[in-house]
Design a protein with these regions (language model features):
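Beta-strand-turn-beta hairpins that frame and shape the catalytic cleft
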Residues: 39, 110-113, 137-140
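An N-terminally biased module of ancient metal coordination in phosphate/nucleic-acid-related enzymes
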Residues: 1-110, 129-132, 213
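An anionic oxygen-ligand recognition environment, strongly enriched in 2H phosphoesterase
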Residues: 116
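A short C-terminal boundary segment appended to hydrolase-like catalytic domains
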Residues: 240-278
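Domain-core and long-helix interface of multi-subunit machines
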Residues: 23-35, 48-53, 86, 119-221, ...
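Acidic, PIN/NYN-like endoribonuclease modules and their adjacent C-terminal/linker elements
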Residues: 224-236, 240
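Short, charged, surface-exposed secondary-structure boundary motifs
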Residues: 109-113, 214-215, 231-235
């Protein structure tokens, strides 16, 4: 059986689990409260990159891989500050049994913000508040990406808990990414889950994949069959992040590709991909 089909079976065997935290990448799984969901569920990887930003696969290669090597039913292509790759992926996926959400990982001044269900590119470099407003103006959903990742500019460093509550409620997120398969050390996911719980916000999971080998490692489980059902599940707080961490080999490969990008494309592209410049 394909390795990407195993996590779903493992997740279904667990219920009433606040968070199972495992430090054995690719074999043990992080699971949130599966008891919220019925048996009929859909799997969506909501954090994927292509060659239209800093990923190593084209949008077409991504769709072919998802269809042939995973049991994902929905994906969101979320290139850095760009939606052209997502549009290509969506068009190519027509009739192939996979729903593609137009997404973007936007480099706001305070950190990365994931936009879903947008139709126009949102420019980087705005404040988090203005970025969220721009997403909502398009009818999209705004999600705090890896908010406690210490390696990139992240919203947790700029007061996520204070700004998203009644104290300073300008950060009106629709959800928080509480399972990002790429994070190392792993406690950043645990901290994000605690923040989402405290704020009463839905949680999502994604692989943050920049290469095909890690597509589907992290994902979001919800009741439904398609992207439209995912939007509804997020609105009602009925999503469940689950999946595996990147292995140390995956991390090494990703680091090597970052070094290669620096040498081939210049420092600015690499720095933009981790949110240090806009």
């Amino acid at each position: 059986m394909d390795q990407h089909k195993t996590p779903h079976e493992s997740v279904n065997a667990m219920s009433q689990t606040t968070l199972v935290y495992c430090d054995a990448p690719s074999t043990d799984y992080i699971v949130a409260d599966q008891s919220l969901l019925p048996l009929t569920t859909c799997k969506a990887d909501l954090h994927l990159h292509t060659t239209h930003s800093d990923g190593s696969c084209t949008p077409i290669e991504l769709i072919d891989y998802v269809v042939n090597h995973t049991d994902l039913q929905v994906i969101a292509t979320t290139d850095h500050d760009e939606i052209s790759g997502a549009q290509i992926a969506r068009d190519y996926a027509q009739g192939r049994g996979i729903d593609v959400i137009i997404g973007e990982e936007i480099s706001s001044r305070e950190g990365h913000i994931l936009a879903y269900f947008v139709h126009e590119r949102i420019a980087p470099g705005m404040s988090a508040r203005d970025t969220i407003c721009a997403i909502h103006e398009q009818g999209g959903l705004a999600v705090a990406a890896h908010p406690y990742d210490w390696m990139v500019r992240s919203l947790g460093r700029y007061g996520l808990m204070q700004r998203a509550t009644g104290i300073q409620p300008e950060w009106a997120f629709d959800a928080i990414e509480t399972l990002n398969s790429s994070l190392f050390p792993r406690y950043a996911n645990v901290t994000a889950q605690r923040a989402a719980t405290a704020l009463g916000l839905p949680m999502i999971g994604g692989s943050d994949s920049h290469q095909l080998r890690t597509v589907g490692y992290g994902y979001t489980v919800y009741a439904g069959r398609n992207a439209s059902d995912l939007r509804s599940a997020l609105r009602h707080g009925r999503t469940c992040p689950a999946g595996a961490n990147w292995s140390y080999t995956d991390l090494a490969v990703a680091t090597g590709r970052l070094v290669q990008r620096v040498s081939m494309a210049g420092v600015s592209l690499a720095l933009r991909s981790i949110g240090l410049v806009s």
